[in-house]
Amino acid sequence: MSEEQVNIKKKEKWGIAHIYSSYNNTIIHITDITGAETISRWSGGMVVKADRDEPSPYAAMLAARRAAEEALEKGIVGVHIRVRAPGGSKSKTPGPGAQAAIRALARAGLKIGRVEDVTPIPHDGTRPKGGRRGRRV
């Protein structure tokens, strides 16, 4: 490779897209590769008016698109994605907005590196709510 090609490769700036998706909201937070500096942060509640629309895939898509536009303006060309659900004693599965957010980031022109699930898993942590016999429906 010539020296010019090496310089072009070095200048590619990557970030991390932290996607927190619950059944109440979706939060997209893009940071630099170390995770220390925030580049862009959007949530479903920031892009829709009605509270009931916050967790929807549509709100997640809009939030991800705006976050991606902001990141591209600041020189980020690609992101590694870290998906997180509430976890712990709460839901271990990401909400409905997670997949839509990943798709929107890809469509917005960001390169996608690795996608990993960083949901906290308890190693026998706190007692789940609902009492001894669980939630009776």
From Swiss-Prot:
GO BP, sorted A to Z: translation
Keywords: Ribonucleoprotein, Ribosomal protein, RNA-binding, rRNA-binding
A GO molecular-function annotation: structural constituent of ribosome
Chain positions covered by the region annotation Disordered: 116-137
A Pfam family the protein falls into: Ribosomal_S11
GO-annotated cellular components: ribonucleoprotein complex; ribosome
InterPro entries: Ribosomal_uS11 (IPR001971), Ribosomal_uS11_archaeal (IPR019961), Ribosomal_uS11_CS (IPR018102), Ribosomal_uS11_sf (IPR036967)
Self-association and partners: Part of the 30S ribosomal subunit.
PANTHER family: 40S RIBOSOMAL PROTEIN S14/30S RIBOSOMAL PROTEIN S11 (PTHR11759)
Entry similarity comment: Belongs to the universal ribosomal protein uS11 family.
Entry protein name: Small ribosomal subunit protein uS11
Gene symbol of the encoding locus: rps11
